[in-house]
Regions:
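Hydrophobic alpha-helical signal peptides and transmembrane signal-/tail-anchor segments
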Residues: 7-15
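Glycine/serine-rich phosphate-binding loop and adjoining beta1-alpha1 elements at the start
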Residues: 83-221
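Rossmann-like adenosine-cofactor binding region
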Residues: 257-358
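Glycine-rich phosphate/diphosphate-binding loop of Rossmann-like nucleotide-binding domains
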Residues: 185-299
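N-terminal cap/recognition module
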Residues: 48-80
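Adenosine-phosphate binding glycine-rich loop
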Residues: 323-425
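N-terminal glycine-rich anion-binding loops that anchor highly charged ligand groups
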Residues: 39-52, 83-88
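Short, Gly/Pro- and small/polar-rich lid/capping loops
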Residues: 16-34
Length: 425
């Protein structure tokens, strides 16, 4: 490199992580699309943080009380996630402020997608997210409006695919995302017809833990104790895959209650707890009250913690109790699990990162984003083993890059963020 260029770039390389983050967080998004439903009180936003690589991607969520700021922060989270999962595109998110339990939900979604279809045709790819289901909501509604697949905007905007390429990529997406799992190694029950979309995120969260132990000290997950927060698709699947590797799930805390078993549940017990869920809720005859579990679980001692419930729930006090109980690694199933107002890295997250190994959300839970990227590759092999193996390799590569920076077991999240942001800022 020319000396002048080095002199120009030098301050940039020295920018501390905090400054990089502030710069990225405070940059105005390129596109904000605002919508007000004509028939109900629903309102919504598409935030496209950037059209990096000609397109942007991010799911559609619905919840009462959601605002534009939440959508904007999630769009920025997606942009960071794409640095790990690929493709090299911008981050986006759609959010609708409406009660998902309201019987008018379907009509709201239909009118929403009618309004945003031009974006989805050209440069924005979406999918399911909180309270919006990929397979039952997004795909059928957008199909009715002439979209071949909710990721079509990325195929057009980023890949600039020719007609035959477009047919291949969209065909792979249509087949792969809803693919029913046929390999007993990847599903708790073949008869239940779970799909790739149901299980891939939780699988990635568990694989992140396995790769962490191998890369930092050549250790195994077997025999390690794990606590799981949240028993939806991500938490329950992560627990199932960890138990399959020999980890001992010693505590589960869910919205309505939980379970604690100090010597750990057997793989078969975890499998049954997975299969017996009601919707996304933990059910068991011996369920403890939320208050009792919340009182006991944080100090019960475990090496692994999987936050996989809603965002911003985990408090500083809970982290301190976990650390005192011999915690070694946190694999973030939830986006932004720590109770900080900051978009990415607040004081609680920073405290955790300084005292234990934190695998950040954009690495640990990038499974679904990675499946989309994989299925847009030319001639993707659509088998359970190929799809799950690809997600596992991508997560491992991201952790390997962080490990090459330092063998320290703290600061893992900070180093991972820094490497991602240098690609974006």
């Amino acid at each position: 490199l020319d000396n002048k260029i080095i002199a120009f770039l030098f301050p940039f390389f020295l920018l501390p992580m905090k400054d990089l983050l502030a710069k990225f967080e405070n940059k105005r998004p390129e596109i904000v699309f605002e919508w007000k439903d004509a028939e109900t009180e629903a309102e919504g936003w598409v935030v496209i943080n950037s059209l990096r690589g000609g397109a942007a991607g991010g799911g559609t969520r619905m919840r009462k009380g959601l605002d534009k700021r939440e959508v904007e922060s999630l769009a920025k989270t997606m942009e960071v996630k794409f640095t790990v999962s690929g493709p090299a595109i911008g981050g986006a998110k759609s959010g609708i402020n409406f009660d998902p339990q309201d019987p008018r939900k379907r009509g709201v979604l239909e009118r929403w997608y009618r309004a945003v279809i031009p974006l989805l045709k050209n440069y924005y790819g979406t999918g399911g997210d909180l309270n919006v289901d990929e397979i039952h909501d997004v795909i059928p509604i957008t199909e009715d409006y002439g979209l071949w697949h909710p990721q079509e905007g990325i195929v057009n905007g980023h890949y600039r695919a020719t007609e035959p390429q477009k047919i291949q990529k969209l065909g792979q997406l249509r087949q792969g995302v809803v693919k029913v799992l046929e390999d007993a190694a990847f599903t708790p029950d073949l008869r239940r017809k779970y799909t790739v979309a149901d299980l891939i995120t939780g699988y990635g969260v568990a694989e992140a833990v396995r790769h962490y132990y191998e890369l930092w000290g050549g250790r195994s997950v077997a025999g390690k104790r794990a606590i799981v927060q949240g028993w939806g698709n991500v938490g329950a699947a992560a627990a199932y895959y960890l138990a399959s590797q020999g980890a001992r799930i010693t505590g589960i805390i869910d919205r309505a209650g939980g379970l604690i078993k100090e010597d750990g549940f057997s793989l078969e017990e975890i499998r049954q707890l997975f299969l017996q869920r009601e919707g996304n809720a933990l059910t068991a005859p011996n369920l403890l009250s939320f208050d009792e579990v919340n009182q006991r679980i944080w100090s019960s001692g475990s090496e692994i913690f999987i936050p996989a419930a809603a965002s911003r729930l985990v408090t500083r006090q809970q982290v301190e109790q976990l650390i005192a109980g011999n915690l070694e690694v946190i694999s973030c199933g939830a986006n932004v699990p720590f109770q900080d107002p900051e978009i990415f890295f607040g004081p609680t997250g920073e405290f955790a990162d300084q005292h234990t190994s934190v695998i950040p959300d954009f690495v640990a839970n990038c499974g679904m984003a990675r499946v989309f990227a994989y299925l847009m590759e030319t001639n993707a092999e659509i088998t359970d083993q190929a799809i799950f193996g690809d997600t596992s390799r991508v997560i491992r590569r991201a952790l390997e890059r962080t490990r090459q920076q330092s063998d320290s077991r703290t600061g893992v999240a900070q180093k991972s963020f820094e490497m991602a942001l240098r690609q974006l800022v």
